[in-house]
């Protein structure tokens, strides 16, 4: 098994970022309409099975909106709250209906109860106990590729997190061979897109993105299998769910500018998706640890944990130490991973280049001590 993986890993990996760098060196114009990404690292997939990233189709609602342009406008209903946060009893929280201040405590309690339900949790050791032909390395390669797919189709981040959750839960219950792993990935993303997106990509888009390696019927069948195995329990909270709740509390002073902190948290949270070792951790634990490491990166001279964060997250820094260490190691790439999609994504200017920022090599032990009351 290890030999096959090493042989596959030795094959040249053609990603969008790599293609862009090659184009810059050779000064060869690359057509912008058809960008290709390879998933060749999956054993048994040859370099001929390149993945074509198809430009996102125009929103389906465009024509409908135009046809009714002349009709008199009706008062729009108040927007549904898109962000769940924990709000203090202050004037700012009470005055903003988007923050759901009256219900924040109930929402938080409900999400905490959901995340610990066995039916919504993957097995901590499914690679060792359930899978025969799939390894943790293959899982990481698949997730890295799905990050690029989500970027190409401009999917919201919740879709990516749900996709990985579905994959882990499915693999915890059913063994599959490596040839079906990419099929599982696109089918899981198809389901997550239907759950989260306003205009999700259709089945044909996901077939095309695999260079038609799989037929429409195969994707639909795998979609059905996923739904049945997961018993149609598709709405579980993810790391992103809790991250939204914790970020506002971590912006309690001007030391942590709003956008850099938010982007840094998003970057670290996506890195955690690559790590099989994070599967065993609760989403709220990962989210709290991500906030700790993000604040440490942006200001290493100040204890990144605070009484307010401890109260909002429900965790002391000492309780998060193992997860914080894991996230910290991922950020420093201490395992020497070659999976670069997330790092390249967050190098972009629109994300403030947060992936180029590094935390201190060692986290001071004093930062894990209990805070004084």
Curated annotation (Swiss-Prot):
Identify the keywords attached in UniProt to this record, alphabetized.
Answer: Cell cycle, Cell division, Cyclin
Which family is it part of? Belongs to the cyclin family. Cyclin AB subfamily.
Q: Which Gene3D superfamilies match?
A: Cyclin-like (1.10.472.10)
Q: What domain of life does the UniProt record list for this protein's source? A: Eukaryota
Give the record's GO CC terms.
Answer: cyclin-dependent protein kinase holoenzyme complex; cytoplasm; nucleus
Signal peptide location in the record? Answer: none
* Chain spans, region Disordered: 50-80
> Quick one: a GO biological-process term for this protein?
G1/S transition of mitotic cell cycle
Question: Which molecular-function annotation in GO is an example for this chain?
Answer: cyclin-dependent protein serine/threonine kinase regulator activity
> What name is this protein filed under?
Cyclin-A3-1
């Amino acid at each position: 098994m290890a030999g096959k993986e090493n042989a596959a890993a030795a094959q040249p990996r053609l990603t969008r970022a790599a293609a862009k760098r090659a184009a810059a060196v050779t000064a060869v114009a690359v057509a912008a309409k058809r960008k290709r990404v390879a998933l060749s690292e999956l054993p048994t997939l040859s370099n001929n099975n390149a993945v074509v990233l198809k430009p996102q189709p125009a929103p389906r609602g465009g024509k409908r909106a135009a046809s009714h342009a002349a009709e008199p406008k009706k008062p729009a209903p108040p927007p549904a709250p898109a962000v769940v946060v924990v709000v203090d009893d202050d004037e700012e929280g009470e005055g903003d209906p988007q923050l759901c201040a009256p219900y924040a405590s109930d929402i938080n309690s409900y999400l905490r109860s959901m995340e610990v339900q066995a039916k919504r949790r993957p097995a901590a050791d499914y690679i060792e106990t359930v899978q025969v032909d799939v390894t943790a390395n293959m899982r990481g390669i698949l997730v890295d590729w799905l990050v690029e797919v989500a970027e190409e189709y401009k999917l919201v981040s919740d879709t990516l997190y749900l996709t990985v959750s579905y994959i882990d839960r499915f693999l915890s219950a059913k063994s599959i061979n490596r040839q079906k792993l990419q099929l599982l990935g696109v089918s899981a993303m198809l389901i997550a897109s239907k759950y989260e997106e306003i205009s999700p990509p259709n089945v044909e888009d996901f077939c095309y993105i695999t260079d038609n390696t799989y037929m429409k019927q195969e994707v639909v069948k795998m979609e059905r299998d996923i739904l049945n195995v997961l018993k149609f329990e598709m709405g579980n909270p993810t790391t992103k769910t809790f991250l939204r709740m914790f970020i506002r509390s971590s912006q309690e002073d001007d030391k942590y500018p709003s956008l850099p902190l938010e982007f840094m948290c998003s970057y670290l949270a996506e890195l955690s998706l690559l790590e099989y070792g994070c599967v065993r951790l609760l989403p709220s634990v990962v989210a709290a640890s991500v906030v700790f490491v993000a604040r440490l990166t942006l200001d290493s001279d100040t204890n990144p944990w605070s009484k307010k964060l401890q109260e909002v997250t429900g965790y002391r820094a000492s309780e998060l130490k193992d997860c914080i260490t894991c996230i910290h190691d991922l950020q420093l790439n201490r395992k020497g991973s070659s999976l670069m999609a997330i790092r390249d994504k967050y190098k972009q200017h629109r994300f403030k280049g947060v992936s180029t920022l590094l935390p201190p090599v060692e986290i001071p032990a004093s930062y894990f001590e209990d805070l004084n009351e």
